[in-house]
Design a protein with these regions (language model features):
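Internal, well-ordered alpha/beta segment that forms a basic, Gly-enriched binding/recognition surface
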Residues: 86-203
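Hydrophobic, aromatic-lined core segments that form the binding pocket/scaffold
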Residues: 148-393
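Compact, well-ordered interaction domains used in eukaryotic information-processing assemblies
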Residues: 73-78, 84
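Short acidic (Asp/Glu) patches
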Residues: 64-72
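Active-site beta-strand-loop-beta-strand hairpin of nuclease catalytic cores
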Residues: 47-58
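Cysteine-centric segments in proteins
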Residues: 2, 6, 32-37, 43-45
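Active-site ExK catalytic segment of metal-dependent nucleases
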Residues: 56-64, 85-87
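Short Lys/Arg-enriched alpha/beta "domain-start" segment
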Residues: 1-28
Length: 395
């Protein structure tokens, strides 16, 4: 039931009657807030009017009011910012850590909605709505998918704007950090973002024309040059030179230590996806030229975008996947499918966010056009929806 309440709150699927707190004060929901997938209140930065007074803060949702105490929120200062407690059953008043009462809203769902929700939850096929998709008009499905695409882009835009704020409004830095995250292709996404957040971009700009020095920055801050990580047999002339260069750059620019090397994942990865190779490709891309995001803003076609994302590695990595371990000679370029994933997850969201920020509708339309021209990702979720029938015509 709690998950259903989340959905109802997020999409503001409220009853037509005026919403009221449990003590009779009128509630107007201006903004339901940003859903939080991590620890803490369920929705951040909601905007409400309670009895005519504007409130901005967080929302917590439970099935029963008493769940607030059962989960220990009354003793957790992280929940003092909650401005409204949304529940389907009221069985007690709730308080902040200082004893102050928090307003509560009783939100009920119609019986037929609850019944449909239960049917979908217990369905043994995916997607759960599989049996009814074929009966829906194509226009309905197309409109729904378009709305979902816009919603997804707006969610990514919020994350990008947060990252931009951390980068002091530098679009190039924020773009590179996002690009790095998506070079992790899922498994190493968090590690790549952590690493990219350590990069001293202004210092690296002074050495951009030297690929070896860029690699020293990259591998050093990734923790991959540490003696605790490099086994003796992995030390070779190249890794030793990189390590010495990184120590020099550390002193020159007063750079801190590299990241915790245990954050990198290698298990079940194909060698082409090892962090060493992806870092080498990023180094080549970074060294190739500055203002990458600015150049992407001027790219009118997917062909232009793919050309800007063309990357390879330094010659050392053409016969290595790890330091000190020879492998058959092979140029480590990025395949077209990998490029398209980068476009879907990095370029398109950034173009869309930039268009929103600059009120440039043309840029938002270009982002949407690129998405429509690209083939969908090939994963079990996409395949399941495609097998359902009516969805396949949209690709």
């Amino acid at each position: 039931m709690e998950h259903l309440l989340h959905y109802v709150w997020k999409h503001k699927l409220f009853p037509l009657k005026v919403l009221q707190t449990t003590n009779g004060l009128p509630v107007e929901v201006i903004d339901s807030g940003l859903q939080n997938p991590n620890a803490g209140p369920d929705f951040f930065n909601a905007k409400l009017k309670i009895d005519g007074t504007l409130w901005v803060g967080n929302i917590e949702i439970h099935t029963h009011s008493s769940d607030w105490f059962r989960h220990g929120h009354n003793c957790d200062k992280a929940y003092d910012s909650v401005i409204l407690h949304v529940v389907s059953e009221v069985d007690t008043e709730i308080t902040r850590t200082n004893g102050e009462q928090i307003p509560q809203l009783l939100l009920t769902c119609p019986e037929n909605v609850q019944s449909h929700y239960h049917e979908l939850c217990v369905a043994d096929h995916y997607p759960a709505c599989y049996p009814i998709l074929a009966s829906l008009p194509k226009l309905t499905i197309h409109s729904w998918l378009t709305a979902l695409q816009t919603e997804r882009l707006e969610q990514k835009a919020q994350l990008i704007m947060h990252r931009l704020e951390l980068c002091n409004s530098n679009w190039e830095d924020a773009f590179f950090i996002t690009l790095a995250r998506n070079f992790g292709f899922g498994l190493n996404g968090d590690a790549f973002e952590t690493w990219a957040g350590l990069l001293p971009f202004r210092a690296m700009d002074k050495h951009r024309n030297d690929l070896f020095q860029i690699e020293a920055f990259f591998y050093g801050l990734a923790g991959l040059l540490e003696n605790t990580f490099l086994k003796k047999e992995q030390e070779d002339e190249y890794s030793i030179r990189l390590c010495k260069e990184f120590r020099y750059l550390q002193r020159k620019f007063e750079i801190g230590q590299g990241m915790d090397v245990t954050l990198w994942r290698f298990l079940r990865l194909r060698p082409e996806n090892f962090p060493h190779i992806r870092l080498a490709q990023l180094a080549y891309l970074y060294q190739k030229g500055d203002k990458l995001f600015s150049r992407l803003l001027e790219a009118d076609t997917l062909t232009d975008v793919r050309a800007l994302l063309d990357t390879r590695t330094s010659s050392y990595w053409e016969n290595h996947y790890l330091f000190g371990r020879l492998s058959p000679q092979k140029e480590k370029t990025m395949g077209e499918r990998s490029k398209d994933l980068i476009i879907i997850n990095t370029v398109v969201p950034f173009l869309y966010t930039y268009g929103l920020h600059k009120t440039d509708e043309r840029m938002c339309e270009r982002a949407s056009r690129f998405l429509e021209e690209l083939k969908a990702e090939s994963n079990h979720i996409i395949r399941s929806w495609s097998d359902a029938g009516p969805v396949s015509y949209t690709h």
